[in-house]
Amino acid sequence: MTAGFHVIGDAAVSVVVAAFERAVDDFGIAAVARCGHRREHVEMVTADQAAKLGAWGIIASVQPNFDALWGGSNGMYARRLGIYRGSRLNNFALLASQGVPLAFGSDAPVTGLDPWVSVRAAANHRTPGSAVSMRAAFAAATRGGWRAAGVRDGVTGTLTPGAPASYAVWDIGERDVFAPRDAIQRWSTDPRSRLPALPRLGLTDALLRCRQTVHRGAVIYG
C-alpha cells in the first residue's frame, strides 16, 4: 500500500523521516521502496534527510511555482523565515542529487495548472544552486507524475511505441536540446538520439499554448 504525507515545514519533515526510519528498521529498505510512498510539498529538507529519502525510494511531489512566487531574497519565504532559512526551501537540486524521485504539480488552485510554468520555475530557481536542468524538470512534470501515482510500467508518460497514447500538442517557439554534455548537445537534434529538443523557457520567453489534448487515443480537447 502506498502512503502519502502532507509535509511542509522542518518539524513535519523530521517526523516523517523518523517514521520511515522505523519502517526501514522493521521491514527493510526494499520493502519500503517497493511501495512508492510519497511526500507532498516537502519544502524544508536537509541534505541528510534527502539522502535517506533517496535511499528509501520516497517520492517528492513538489510545486516549483511556489519558488517562483515566494522564493528569492526578497520573497515571502525570506520575509517570514529570514533569508538564510527562506533560501533553503524547495531545493530541487538537493533532492535530485540524492536520488529522490521528483514529481511536479501545481497544488491548484494555490498556483495555476500550466505545467510549463512549473518546468520553467524549476529550471530558473530563484536560489542559485537549487534548480534542476530543463530535461530533469520535463521528466518530473511528465513521467514523474505517473510514477508518483503508482504507474511504473516504464512507458506511461513517454512518447514511445507501445506507450498509452496520452499526450498534449503545443505551439512552441525557439527550441533547445538539453543534454548532460555539450558534445552531445551539438549533434543530438536527430530524433534517433532520444534527446528531443525542448522549448526555450527562460524567464522572458513566452509560455506555450496548448492546441490539443489526447488521453489513451481519445481527443478530449482541440
Pin down the residues of each PLM region:
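Short amphipathic alpha-helical segments, especially helix-boundary/capping motifs
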Residues: 25-27, 66-69, 93-96, 118-123
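Active-site core of metal-dependent hydrolases
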Residues: 1-89, 103
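Feature representing long, continuous alpha-helical segments
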Residues: 14, 18, 37, 51, ...
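Active-site microenvironment of metallo-dependent hydrolases
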Residues: 7, 97, 101, 108-222
